[in-house]
UniProtKB/Swiss-Prot annotation:
Species whose genome carries this gene: Arabidopsis thaliana (Mouse-ear cress)
Record's keyword annotation contains Amino-acid biosynthesis: no
Pathway participation: Protein modification; protein ubiquitination
Keywords: Ubl conjugation pathway
Any one Pfam family match given in the protein's UniProt record, by short name: F-box-like
All copies of domain F-box, residue ranges: 32-79
Descriptive protein name: F-box protein SKIP5
GO biological process, one term: protein ubiquitination
Mitochondrion listed as a keyword: no
Underlying gene: SKIP5
Subunit and partners: Part of a SCF (SKP1-cullin-F-box) protein ligase complex. Interacts with SKP1A/ASK1.
Gene3D superfamilies xref list: 1.20.1280.50
InterPro entries for this protein: F-box-like_dom_sf, F-box_dom, Pectin_lyase_fold/virulence, SHCBP1-like
Superkingdom classification of source: Eukaryota
């Protein structure tokens, strides 16, 4: 029996295959075209229902328009201490409630104006915290006296355009993950016990990895991915404290650059494995 006759017999036995293949051919271009015909507001509303990682991240790879909409500030969570109408979705009075409600990959915009009280806020998922002012000084996080830190970071996180102030403690306590500090101001209040305070403290190291691997069996190739602890500081003012950064794990200070201005010092450096 010839091949084309065999295919005909197969199609007679399974006619649903023909229908399914035709539907796929019709649906794919049609569905994509229909989505592209939506206006920006409607498409952005649809994207807001997607989880930031990995769904919204994947949609940002489709085209320039989808990338613009998937990363638009309207999809960010917002912290506004002056807001009166809390019925608005994604708006919070304080940073702690915003961090608690955030999904992995979310960006939290902290509205400029006034001081936000923070104390030992743990961040256990990948987040980005951004100050809403023109300069970092317009958005200030103040750590209560007696607290260990303003923010305790246990996952990959980025802080941008923020001022963080602390007294008798540290501004940022880095436990694990990749921390990026971009264009911020870290200040430790000057006092007689200045040696007890430090803007950045990192305790990340091999102990964290060993604790994980002792409970979970993983391949050697995965170990390198788990070992992903680091701190990257970019164009950041650091003031007060015994020293800019204190490392109590296996990370060490590397690639330090300092730019002197009339009033401030701006730092670039990495805290990473040797």
């Amino acid at each position: 029996m010839e091949l084309h006759e065999i295919s005909k017999l197969d199609n007679k036995k399974h006619p649903e295959r023909i229908v399914e293949s035709k539907m796929k051919k019709r649906m794919k271009p049609y569905s994509l075209t229909s989505l592209n015909n939506l206006d920006d507001g409607c498409l952005m509303h649809i994207l807001s229902f997607l989880s930031p990682i990995p769904d919204r991240y994947n949609t940002a790879l489709v085209c320039h328009r989808w990338r613009y909409l998937a990363c638009h500030p309207r999809l960010w969570l917002r912290v506004d201490r002056f807001v009166k109408d809390l019925s608005q979705p994604g708006v919070f009075l304080n940073i702690e409630s915003a961090v608690s409600a955030a999904r992995p990959g979310d960006t939290i915009l902290i509205v400029a104006g006034g001081n936000y009280r923070v104390s030992n806020i743990q961040i256990k998922k990948p987040l980005c915290l951004v100050g809403g002012g023109e300069i970092p000084d317009e958005t200030t996080l103040v750590c209560a006296r007696g607290s260990d830190s303003a923010l305790e970071l246990l996952s990959t996180c980025k802080l941008a355009n923020l001022t963080v102030k602390a007294e008798l403690g540290c501004c940022l306590l880095h436990r694990s993950g990749r921390l990026t500090i971009d264009g911020c101001v870290l200040q430790c209040e000057t006092n007689p016990l200045d040696h007890l305070s430090c803007p950045i403290v990192s305790t990340a190291g091999d102990e964290d990895i060993e604790n994980i691997l002792s409970h979970v069996e993983v391949k050697e190739t995965v170990t390198g991915k788990i070992k992903a602890n680091s701190v990257t500081v970019l164009q950041t003012r650091i003031e007060g404290g015994a020293k800019a950064v204190s490392t109590r794990g296996d990370l060490v200070l590397q690639r330090v650059r300092v730019m002197y201005s009339k009033a401030y010092l701006y730092f670039w450096f990495d805290v990473d494995y040797e």
